[in-house]
Structure formats: structure tokens, C-alpha cells
Amino acid sequence: MFAVIETGGKQYLVKKGSIIKVERLQAEEKEEVEINKVICVSNNGLSCSSNAVVKAEVLEQCRDKKIIIFKKKRRKNYRRKNGHRQYITVLRINEISLQK
């Protein structure tokens, strides 16, 4: 069984036991979170259901790898180098369930 969930403005294809990195969630480590925004669920056939719930455990609150931003204008001696590290939450999917 797999599901497509949406969190942080992005969509993720998940199944039970998968580990994903999402935008930062306000939750402590080892806390269980429920994701109610489920786009679709599939057991054998595709089912778009609005009453599905995905339960996940927060493994870690950390920062992602650094992204380098480099701006340059040729022949003008203009160079700017900047870096950014995004806050992320690492989740383990524990359960995908359909509520009635």
C-alpha cells in the first residue's frame, strides 16, 4: 500500500517504513505526527480518498546540506557568493489508514 501526501507545499510518494525529508514541522523528536492531507491511496488500484490518514514518527530535526548561491556579471568585477541551509524534519512512515 502506498500514498501520496502533501506537506510543506510538496508532494511525496510514501509507503509503510519509508523515510522521507520534509520541510520543518513543529514537533519534537520521537513524537508521532498525523498527516491529513493525503492526495491518493493505492492498495491494488488507485483510490483518491479524502478521509485517509498517514501516521509518521519524527526521527530527527536538522538542517539540510548547504546550497551555494553564486551571482556574477561578466566584465564588471561583480561576484557574490552566498549559502543557505534549510531546516528539515526526517520522518519514518508508520501507518497508512483509511478512515470510514
Curated annotation (Swiss-Prot):
Protein keywords: Ribonucleoprotein, Ribosomal protein, RNA-binding, rRNA-binding
GO CC terms in record: cytoplasm; ribonucleoprotein complex; ribosome
GO molecular function, one term: rRNA binding
Record-linked InterPro entries: bL21-like (IPR028909), bL21-like_sf (IPR036164), Ribosomal_bL21 (IPR001787), Ribosomal_bL21_CS (IPR018258)
SUPFAM superfamilies for the chain: L21p-like
Record-level GO BP terms: translation
Listed transmembrane segments: none
Assembly and interaction partners: Part of the 50S ribosomal subunit. Contacts protein L20.
Role played: This protein binds to 23S rRNA in the presence of protein L20.
Family that this chain belongs to: Belongs to the bacterial ribosomal protein bL21 family.
PANTHER family, A to Z: 50S RIBOSOMAL PROTEIN L21, LARGE RIBOSOMAL SUBUNIT PROTEIN BL21M
Record's protein name: Large ribosomal subunit protein bL21
